Amino acid sequence: MVKCSYEQKPFRREVMRTYGANVTPSPSMETEVGRKINAEFPGTTGSLGCAISEAVEAAAQNEGYRYVLGSVLNQVLLHQSVIGLETKAALDKYGIKPDMIIGCAGGGSNLGGLIAPFMGEKLRGEADYRIIAVEPASCPSLTRGKFAYDFCDTGMVCPLAKMYTLGSGFIPAPNHAGGLRYHGMSSTLSQLYHDGLMEAVSVPHTAVLEAA
């Protein structure tokens, strides 16, 4: 579990422990890549990229284990599209036609899932939604990143992906939305943004909490 979230959200880790999980804050001293990151960034609160690297190493070194990336990649967005399908079904039921779709963006799986059916209509010319990704100011991959091939994890063991990225070695400052602290953005969303089919803004987490 990313150390930032491990410390900020103790109830989440305790729920996992209740169901029998061993929960370790990342970066840890239990893996080679974790020790390397701790040495390079003393006192770091980690990132999703760090946790992915440690999980991949742990799976690779233990017989019978496999690691499946849970964000960013296309198959994850496809699975998450149930979010958008249910949203669209609910809106259709009540006769609501949105003109704007807004969602938070970290690695992109939730946003990609939300906008999937709406973006499909937009690409087919059936509707013209304004689609906006809202990312944390502490980790603004779309608004300040570079569109290039990069590793999906800090330890550089996962495959390369073409995406908007701040660099696989980027360690973001802590913020309240630990799940959004990822250095890159889904290749699919990156291409849509690059092609001008969606917008992006970066917002400080304090401003988001005040607005809510």
Residues covered by each model-derived region:
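Short glycine-/small-residue-rich flexible loop motifs, especially phosphate/cofactor-binding loops
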Residues: 13, 88, 209-212
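Repeat-solenoid scaffold signature
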Residues: 100-132
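A glycine-rich helix N-cap at a beta->alpha junction
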Residues: 1-36, 157, 164
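Active-site nucleophile and cofactor-binding loops and adjacent substrate-binding regions
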Residues: 3-5, 102-107, 135, 202-205
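Short glycine/serine/threonine-rich phosphate/pyrophosphate-binding segments
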Residues: 1, 7-10, 104-115, 141-143
